[in-house]
């Protein structure tokens, strides 16, 4: 069994993607009505990437408003766990695995998570946020930095992702990839993942697969 197990946050630990889809859908309708399915277009992108790509030029004046809206949204949103996650992370902990959260979310958002779940930090041995990376996903940098925290090589690590950018990041890092079909359908992410799950509620097949690695 491999030693390092790294997790994205939204769509992997928390089932928040539907909430963000609603938020960005409303932003798109109001500010970018010419772009259909704006929420789908920006899935897996960091806030700076979204702002640079869509809120520059004529819409540059809207940047602060978008950031303010997002901060307020995250301050009041729910953070429901992906079903079965807590049992799965406990299983890994009992195996003595090195676990890390590797998220493009910033410390401001994580402060809301810690406020909601004071023990959240204890679920992982390391937590890496946007402030820790030189480059965002799909660059391999976030996951390679996580491996460095444990002095592990990529071949010793498994990553869990839901977005295309996240899956590409793991692939580029040379790690085994578990894809979660919480954001995109299984057939859409299958080519980028070594193993695909809907959630963690039927862990036995996944656990057996991981133990063979």
Regions found by a protein language model. Name each.
Residues 12, 103-105:
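Conserved phosphate-coupling serine/threonine residues in phosphotransfer and NTP-handling enzymes
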Residues 1-3, 90, 106-108, 112-213:
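Asp-based, Mg2+/Mn2+-dependent phosphohydrolase catalytic module
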Residues 52-90, 95:
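Metal-dependent phosphoesterase signature
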Residues 27, 46-58, 113, 147:
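Helix-loop "lid/cap" segments that line or gate small-molecule binding pockets
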Residues 31-41, 57-67, 120-124, 154:
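Short, surface-exposed acidic
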Residues 43-45, 81:
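Residue-level signature of the cytosolic catalytic core of signaling kinases
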Residues 95-97, 175:
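Short phosphate-binding/catalytic loops that engage adenosine nucleotides
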């Amino acid at each position: 069994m491999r030693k390092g197990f790294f997790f994205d946050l939204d769509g992997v630990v928390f089932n928040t993607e539907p909430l963000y889809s609603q938020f960005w859908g409303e932003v798109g309708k109001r500010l970018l009505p010419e772009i259909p399915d704006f929420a789908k277009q920006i899935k897996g992108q960091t806030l700076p990437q979204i702002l640079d790509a869509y809120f520059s030029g004529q819409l540059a004046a809207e940047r602060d408003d978008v950031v303010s809206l997002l901060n307020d949204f995250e301050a009041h949103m729910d953070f429901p766990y992906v079903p079965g996650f807590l049992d799965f992370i406990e299983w890994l902990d009992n195996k003595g695995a090195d676990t890390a959260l590797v998220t493009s979310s910033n410390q401001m958002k994580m402060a809301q998570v810690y406020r909601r779940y004071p023990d959240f930090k204890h679920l992982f041995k390391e937590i890496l946020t946007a402030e820790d990376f030189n480059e965002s996903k799909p660059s391999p940098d976030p996951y390679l930095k996580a491996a460095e925290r444990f002095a592990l090589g990529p071949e010793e690590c498994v990553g869990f992702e839901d977005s295309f950018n996240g899956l590409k990041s793991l692939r580029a890092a040379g790690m085994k990839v578990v894809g979660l079909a919480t954001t995109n359908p299984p057939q859409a992410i299958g080519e980028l993942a070594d193993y695909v799950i809907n959630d963690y509620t039927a862990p036995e097949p996944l656990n057996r697969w991981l133990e063979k690695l």
